[in-house]
A protein has these predicted regions:
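Walker B beta-strand of ABC/ABC-like P-loop ATPase nucleotide-binding domains
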Residues: 152-154, 185
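Short glycine-rich substrate-engagement loop in P-loop NTPases that contacts/grips substrate
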Residues: 110, 115-151, 164
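Conserved ATPase-coupling elements of RecA-like P-loop NTPase cores
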Residues: 158-171, 195-198
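Short regulatory helix/loop adjacent to the ATP-binding pocket of P-loop NTPases
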Residues: 131-135, 192-208
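Walker B catalytic acidic pair
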Residues: 155-157, 189
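Nucleotide-binding/hydrolysis machinery
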Residues: 191-201, 215-226
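Intrinsically disordered, low-complexity basic tails and flexible linkers associated
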Residues: 1-119, 124, 183, 189, ...
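Sensor-1/coupling segment of RecA-like P-loop NTPase cores
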Residues: 172-173, 177-200
Length: 226
């Protein structure tokens, strides 16, 4: 009996959070997008969620600047895929805590639903993985891998601007996850309506759920952070 192998993404974060192995179909026909649940050839994967345990809600300081986003995030974590906040689109300038908040949601999902597969990935890493899958002639494996995620967190989604093929594959992943009741969490430096270089069909989907902004902290919140 073959042991499952581990899929890891480069990270300096040490985490005790683990996903259960997931089954993904392999050796699929090229240039086809099929239902992954009916394709033969299954391999067990261990998926590293890539969540930094320091980025929890416990360590996330709440203030007027982030109250809506945090409340929505906690609602999503309590019932991933089961709220109107799907996707949850968190936006704001760099350094305001988008990564922390998005990972806090993932951490809470894992705490409350250990059986769910959670994955955090930066949009640039997603792009790199997709390019590598094309180079290695296994695009469908890439597609089916992401279609197996229960809660998918894509950080800095605006970095897919101008990357048409990557946007196309993400469009199919988004549709599959949304239609099967899985949770999507996206972060960006701008609200959906202001995104440049992103296909309109994606922007319209980004607006299906809730867009919540993170603002610069007020004095009271800055004091709490200190």
């Amino acid at each position: 009996k073959k042991k499952p192998y581990t899929v890891k993404f480069p990270t300096n974060n040490k985490t005790e959070l683990k996903n259960k192995p997931v089954s993904v179909p392999l050796k699929t026909e090229e240039n086809s997008i099929k239902n992954p649940f009916v394709i033969p050839g299954i391999k067990k994967l261990h998926v590293d969620p890539r969540l930094n345990p320091d980025n929890s809600f416990t360590n996330y300081i709440e203030g007027e600047c982030n109250r809506l986003a945090r409340s929505a995030g906690e609602a999503v974590a309590d019932k991933p895929g089961g709220t109107a906040f799907n996707p949850l689109f968190i936006y704001g300038d760099s350094g305001l805590g988008k990564t922390h908040l998005s990972q806090a949601i993932g951490i809470k999902v894992k705490e409350q639903y250990p059986e769910k597969t959670v994955l955090y990935v930066n949009a640039n890493k997603f792009q790199t993985q997709f390019v590598e899958s094309i180079r290695n002639n296994n695009k469908n494996d890439f597609l089916h891998f992401y279609q197996m995620i229960d809660t998918l967190i894509i950080d800095d989604i605006h970095e897919l601007a101008g990357k048409e093929k990557t946007q196309d594959i993400f469009f199919h992943i988004f549709n599959h996850l949304h239609q099967t009741g899985k949770q999507l969490i996206l972060t960006s430096d701008k609200p959906p309506i202001e995104l440049q270089g992103i296909e309109q069909r994606l922007i319209s989907r980004f607006k299906w759920g809730l867009s919540a902004d993170l603002q610069a902290p007020d004095l009271e919140t800055r004091i709490k952070i200190l």
